[in-house]
Structures are given as structure tokens and as C-alpha cells.
A protein has these predicted regions:
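Transmembrane alpha-helices and adjacent helix-loop boundaries
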Residues: 1-196
Length: 196
């Protein structure tokens, strides 16, 4: 039972990372998608670079950069601002900005798959831009991107174990610690069953 309570505490951290990442990265991804599709070429370029960097570098590296960069670039110890929770906050920031880039590309592909005739028909019917998006584009977009977003959500579940990179103790890290201390693999199997 001690093992299960320790794994339960780790599971709560994993669930927190998962839920907060989804809560913020899904809408942020939509904003990044709009920025990527903006008519302003400078804005479009900035978001294209952001997406390329986030999708082209490993999440583990991004977590390390988010955690250590403020101190090494600005000499600011953010740990003193946030206390012991800065590790978790750094993990959340890293996950959110990483997954927002992936969701932005998923949304962009979904938006580009909607025929131009849909927009033209909405304009002829007197819909404004927001009404067109809300009543015509968004329902189609949701249906088109749902399978890909679901795949990304499954990847996020597995990626929560990368929080150990900056010493955030989530479920898989707890399982490794228990297995190392007791020289028994049961904790890893239980964690694996809970994870996957």
C-alpha cells in the first residue's frame, strides 16, 4: 500500500502536467495558427520560426532551456520567485509552448483542408468573419483535426515522464526510485499499467 500511495502522488503530478498542458496549449495553438496564417509577413515569419524550433528540437532540451535559461541569460533566479514550485512551472511552460506548436500545425492543416467555396458561400450569405469561423469553419475543423489531436494527446500522456529532466517527480520517476530502492520491478509494472 505504501508503494501505491507513492505512485498515486506521482500520478497526481503526471495528471497535473497533462491537464494544464492541454488546457493552455489547445487554445494557444489556435492563436499560433492564426499568427502563422496572418497576412503580415513579419508576423507569419516569427510564428513559422517558433513552430520550426519547437517541432525541430527535443522536448527534453526545451525543458532544460526553460528551466536554466532565465538564470544564465538574465541572472534571475526564478526559484526564489516561485519557491520550490519553479521546477513544475518550468515543466508546464515547456510542455505548453511545445504542444502549442504541434497543435498549431494540426489546426493549420485542418483550416487549409476546408474548401475556399465554404468561405465564399458564407460571405454571400452575409456572414462576417467571426460568424463564418464560428458557424461554418469551426465545426468542420473540429471534425477534421480530432483524430490527429487525439494522437497528440496520447503522446502527451507518455511525454509527462520527461518531467524528470528538471527533477519534477512524477509517477514514472517514483516507480524507478521504488524499484531501485527495493530491487523489485513491481513498481515499474504497476506504473506502466497505470500510464498506458
Amino acid at each position: 500500500t505504501n508503494m501505491l500511495s507513492m505512485l498515486g502522488n506521482g500520478m497526481l503530478t503526471s495528471l497535473l502536467i497533462f491537464c494544464v498542458t492541454l488546457l493552455f496549449s489547445l487554445p494557444l495553438g489556435l492563436l499560433v495558427c492564426f499568427g502563422r496564417r496572418a497576412k503580415n509577413p513579419i508576423l507569419q515569419w516569427i510564428f513559422r520560426i517558433y513552430i520550426s524550433v519547437m517541432r525541430g528540437t527535443p522536448l527534453m532540451l526545451q525543458l532544460v532551456v526553460v528551466y536554466f535559461a532565465p538564470y544564465y541569460l538574465f541572472g534571475v533566479s526564478l526559484g526564489s520567485l516561485f519557491g520550490g514550485n519553479y521546477r513544475l512551472i518550468a515543466v508546464l511552460i515547456g510542455f505548453i509552448i511545445n504542444y502549442a506548436a504541434y497543435f498549431a500545425e494540426i489546426y493549420r492543416a485542418g483550416l487549409e483542408s476546408i474548401p475556399v467555396g465554404q468561405y465564399e458561400a458564407a460571405k454571400v450569405l452575409g456572414y462576417g468573419r467571426m460568424a463564418t469561423f464560428q458557424h461554418i469553419v469551426l465545426p468542420q475543423l473540429t471534425r477534421r483535426v480530432l483524430p490527429t489531436v487525439t494522437n497528440e494527446v496520447i503522446t502527451l500522456i507518455k511525454d509527462t515522464s520527461l518531467a524528470y529532466t528538471v527533477s519534477v517527480v512524477e509517477m514514472f520517476t517514483v516507480a524507478k526510485q521504488i524499484s531501485a530502492a527495493e530491487t523489485d520491478m513491481t513498481a515499474l509494472f504497476v506504473a506502466g499499467a497505470m500510464y498506458y
